Every structure is written in C-alpha cells, then in structure tokens.
Amino acid sequence: HGMNAAIDSLMSQYHRQLWEQYRLFGLEYGTGQELEQEFSEFLEPYLEAENWYPMDLKKVEKTELVSLTDRNGQILEDQILDYMRYGLLNVRWEELSEEEAGELLRSVREAAAVEEVAEQYEGHSGEALKLEKCLESIDRCLNQQKQQWEEGGKMLEDLNGDAFIRRGQQVIRQLERVPSLVERYEEEAEALGEKLAASRNFYKQKRSDISGQIASCLEEEMAVYETYISRDGERRKEVEGLKEASSNNCQYVQNTIEEAREVQEFIDQWEPDEDGEEELDEEELWEPVIRKWDQYPHLTIGVRFGVEDQEKGDLLEQVKTMLSGKLLPLVLPEGRQASGRRPDLSGAPSVLISRDEKQSAASLLERLMIGEYILRFFNRYDEKRKDPGSCDYEMEYILFGYGGDQENLEEMALRLLTLRQGMNLIHIFSDSQKREAARNLAAAIVGGIGILPLTGVVAFLIMGVWALGEAFWDVRALFDGGKIPLVKTRDSWQLSLENLLDLGKKGALSQEGKAESSGLDYRGYGRILLFLTHGSGTDYRVMDLIQSDLRQKQEEFRMDRCAHQVDMKAGICGKHVFFSLGLWKSFFGSGDTGYELDFEVSGSYL
C-alpha cells in the first residue's frame, strides 16, 4: 500500500501548464536521482507509521524512466489518443468511419499519383515542342540557303561574278550548319524516346494507386506520345537524309563557284585587240554557270512540323512558369502579409532526439484523431486557437518543419496546389466535354502544319495546365476563407480555357469565382495533409512547439525532462517482532534480527 501511495503522490506532481494548455501529462524532473529522492520522501512516512512490522528504507532505485519524447513519438501519440477518445465524448467533430478514412486516403493517393504521372508527361509535351523547334531551326537554315541561292542567281543575271561568289559562299555556310542541326534534332528525339520509356515504367509503379476508369483515360492520353514518337520516327528517316544531301550540295556549290572564278578571271584578264573590233560576250561566258546554278537542287525539310499558333502555346508555358515560382504573393488576399516569425528551436526535441523517420503505426482513425488534436490545440494561418508562441503558423510548422512562418506557409500553398491539381486532373479525365475542349484548343495551336499526333501531345499539356490554373484559383479561395469541394463537378469548376490563356497573358485571373457553400475550407485541407503525412517527424514537431510555448513562462522547460512512466524499486529492512536471540546474541555474533525485501512499483499516466 505504501509503495502504491508513494508512486501515486509522485505522479500527481505533473506539470500543470502542460496539462491545462495541451491536455498532456508529464512529470517534470531534473535528474533520475532527484526522482528517487522525491519518491523516498513520499514513501518514508508510511514506513515510519507505528505498526506491528517496523521497517527502514535502505535504498531506492529507479528501474525505468520513460519520457514524453521517447519511443519515436509513440508516447506522445498514446497520450493524445487517450485524451481524444475519452476527453471529447460529448464534443462534436468531423469524425469518419474506418471505411471513410480509407476511401479518403485512396482518393488523395490517387490524386497524388495522377499529378505525378501527368507532371512527367506534361514535361514530355514541352520536350516534343522543343523537338518541333529543332525542325524549325533546320527549316530556317534551309530557307536562308534558298534565299542566298536566289540572290546568287540575280547576281549572275547582272553578270556580277564577285557578288555571286560571295553569295555562293554564304550558301555553303548555311549548308554546313545542317548536319549539326540534324544531329541536335536526333539527340532530342532519342532523349525523348528514352524519357517516355522511363515515364511508362513510372506509371506502372503508380498504377495500383489509380482507379480503373481514371487509369483508362490516362492511358488513352499517354498513348498519343507513343504515336507521336512512332510518326516522328518516319520523319527522322527523311530528316537524316539532309546530312548527306547538304554535303553533296556543298560540293555542288563549291564546283559552281570554281567555274565562276574561272569565268571572272578570264573576264578580268581579257584585253581587246589593237583595232578594238573584237568584243567580249560576257553573257555567253556566264551562260554555263547560270545553267548549272539554275539546276542547283536546293534543299527543303520535306516533312510536316511545328505549331501554327505559337502565341497560345507560349501562354500555356507562361502559366506553368508563373505558378512554379513563389506562390504566396499570388494567393494571399489583398493587403495581407505572411508572418515573418520564426519558432524557437533551441534544444528542440526534433533536433536533439534521435529517431526513425517513418510513418506512424497508428490506424487510419487514430491518425485522424491526432490530426484533430493538432487542429484544436495549435494555431494555423486561418485561425488562432491561443496566444501565439514563437510562431503564428503552428500547424504548418508541424507539417513541414521549416525554420520560419513564411517558408512553412509557402510550402502549404505548394502542397495545396499539388493536391488540387491532381484532383482537378481526375475531374478533367472524367469529363468528356473538357477533354474535347482541350483537344479543340490543341488543334487550333498545332493547326495544319504539324503531324497529327502532336495535337494529342499538346492536348495533354493543356489539360495539365488547365488543372493547374484551376488549382491556383482553388488555393487562392482557400487562403481567402472559401471552401473548395475535394471532388469537383461541372458546376463547381471555375476556370474556362479562355480565362486560362488570359491568366498566362496578364498574370492574374480576370474572373471572380463563384462562392461555394459546401466543400472543405483551409482547416479541412489541413486535416487531409496531417492525415497523409503523420509520422514521427510530425510528433516531434508537436513537441517542439509545446516546449517553445511553455518556455515563454519557464525558460528551462524541456519536453525530454517530462516523464510519462516511472518505475521504482525500494529496498526495505524489516525487524522480527515475536522473535529475539536474547542471551544467545553473543554466541551467534552480531545479533541482527532484521531482514531485507525488495519492492517494485510502476507509475504511468496511461
């Protein structure tokens, strides 16, 4: 009884502010020896009490001491879950069933997988357009060759041999550029083929996270890249022939120049006879050169390539470029600035405590409950639950762990953008009208000059950028206190393709979105991110903030000096009451009639 009472008394000295502010129990201590001393002081009154069995306390030893920061964050999770299960029995919160939690996890994982796969293929769209630009470079070079050839012909008509030779040399310079331009095209085509093969393998790895219907739509869009590469293979055979043809033409032009030099030298050296009756017929002299020059087989690229409306294609790239930079200035409401505060991480548990960076072993519902605890006890961008500690965006720090509020809010905007882009892509793939609209715009961009599969490649790019532009609107609405459905419908979709191009042109949205009465707000999406990312890292960042907060009133407070469990062993000496050696004491020696017993007890907050 005395041991149990002593350990209960010891554990009752939990840190009051830790409990009042965060509903966590922790017995603050300095050293293990101090805990042993305190336990002894609680135990001794029970031993000193008058009873039939007088006892003396010989020693006290702690056998186990478990801190809140121990066991890779599991202790913290256990206390949080204990409070959330029994401390909120009469409080309404957005609880999901195990099945609903699993469905949420599958939906978000699918969105992430679709976004990752689409991002790779969107990159291939840019690479395909780059390949088309390689062909455009070859075409420009050949057009310049033709222009110089035509000008050379005019020089011959004017019987200007020196000017013709200069033009001929310019034709040669253009022809000499062709092999390197063709080789660059071949290298880009080869690289694109290899990257597509790698992306196909990447898709196979992600396929298990993508549902059948969305996978079918995605594979249909991905197939156009294979068709493009196949058709480009046919073009490559034609383009490769330009290397040999340009070399042959160089020799042809060089031979013509040599003939022209001979004619020009003859003309320059010709002198009329003394009586001046013989005249030089220059036209007749130049006739063979002119005839040969007219027969020059000037080169053309001979294949379909490029895009007709480059401006619209550039606008799509500008949207991607704009949204790949700093997001906060674009999504924060007008007049609102991000906090520049930085949490006090000196001696932070996440820095000091060695741990395994891995997902928590908590069940899906337990992960949701831990996330709900964080939402209820820590500040975030959209709501202050309590006076701020050393940073304003505590939930965001728990999620991402950067050293300052602004960096964590920037990462929050990026994660929300990525999540929404994936969900928006799923909607586009599921909506035949939007896919058709993307193909129509792609057809307008490619026009009649490019190969047909390029239209599908550009359409995939358009769908990805469209989903990104809509995600930008979504994140801006969330930062402004609005709600966005996790899964969109045609009615809840905001951004038209016309406004998407306008976004690329102006760098801002020209339309105001419809206010949504249903869906998830910033808090709701924060709950999803906490659910997805919860692990030992988030556990320790929770402890970072608790420690930082409590240090404002108690500078030396340390989470790793808050015990969750204390086990003690006491060595107690008792004396026999009804037995004494009496006169035989000297015969048996010391005459010590006591005995020693070890007692163990454990104190824990769970």
PLM-predicted stretches and their roles:
Residues H1-Q33:
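Alpha-helical assembly-interface signal, strongest on the long, hydrophobic N-terminal helix that forms
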Residues L24-L606:
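Long, compositionally biased low-complexity segments
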